Structures are given as structure tokens and as C-alpha cells.
Amino acid sequence: MSLGIPEREAEVRLALDRVTDPELDEPVTDLRFIERLTVDPDGTVSIGFRLPTYWCAANFAFLMAADMQREVATLPWVRQVKVTLGEHMYAEKINHGLANGLSFQATFGNEASAELDELRRTFLLKAFQRRQEALLRYLIERGHQPAGIALIELKALPLDAQGARLRTRYLEKRDICAKPSEPRAFVDTCGNPIEDLNPYLRTLERVSINAEFNGALCRGLLAARFNEDGEPTLLEFARKPPRAA
């Protein structure tokens, strides 16, 4: 039985939930970047998205747009995905590249320093670190000893709902750094064993704090730019207390 338009729209939104801001590792849907979504009976999906400022980096914008196209195109009934960026200094150029199936390098020519693969890899590693830190701190807070934590059998470990969610999110990124045959639950970004957990955690914390700072700033800028209620203002961001150690 074919799906109706509302069901297809729901599937598209679920696909967009898998697309993250590369720096923040948060879904573009949660960040309220998606401004418009339409599904036509012929299987054409049109997505309009926005960013917090007119000057957001072109490579970030292109990366997110390409990821939206890729994820939505995996739905079996989709025939075409049109992604359009609005109110951005490079919107015309980015939209032209997306509409014509061009790479970032082909779209920007000499203005592009490199293709997106290297940038994507950089932010995948940061996402790995943030998710790893969240799970490690959860386990330590619940009594697991740092000395043996790397050898925990994660998949068999009984966890509550919060822990299960943290485990799932971490395992989604674990293979970025660890080989499938790697017996240790936790390795560093080079795939090496973690020799001393405490200084390693401090390194991870710096990555997380930076991402939290950028996330709060992003939401504040988005709310200020589009004059929306319900989002933190820049003043509230400035007053945000430091994260507990």
C-alpha cells in the first residue's frame, strides 16, 4: 500500500533527524534549521533550510545540505530531493551546486580550499569524542572503576534508559576510530588504548565545553535573527552558568 503525503512527510522528518550540524553533533531538526518541507505526489521532496547567520561557513552549509539530500534519497519512494538554503551570502552558489549535483570543489572552484571529506572526518572525530565522554562519565558516576572501564562489554551491560541512549549514540560513532575486531570498549581517536583515563577525560571535556558554547551561541543567534519566541536570547546565553565538573 502506497503512503499518503502526511506519512511521507513524517518519513522525511525522521530522515532529517539523522542529519547533524557537523560542529555541534545535534540534529538539524532539533536546531530548527528546517524552514520548509513539501512532498509532491510524484516523489519529489523539497526542503528549505536556514542558518543562524548570513555569514555561516559555506563548507558547513554545503555539507549539511548534501547530507540532507543523501539521507532523504534513501527513502524508497523518493524520486528527487531539492534542498534550498535561504538568506545566506553564498545561497545562490550553494543552491546552484546542489541543484546540478556538483561537489563543493566544483561549486566554489578556486574559493574552495579542499573537498568536504577532510572536514567531515574532523567533525566525526569530535562527535566521537563528545559521545564517548558522555558515556564514560555516566559509567564512572555509577560506580565503574576507571582502571577497568576500557574492557567493559558494552553491548551486554545492563543500563537504564539514559545509559542505553548514551551507549547507542556512542556505538554509532565507535567504528570511526576503532576496528570492528577491537576488544576494548573505549579507544582514542587514533584507535589506541587509553592509558590514563583522568587526563584523557579532561581532554574530552574541553571538546564538549567548546561544542556546548557554540550550540548555545548558535541557538541565540538563530532566535535573534528570526525573532522567534521560545529560544534562548543572547543575554540568556551570556548568563549561562558554567557546566558542573
In which residue ranges do the predicted regions lie?
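Domain-level signature for proteins that mediate thiol-based redox and metal-cofactor handling
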Residues: 1-54, 59-245
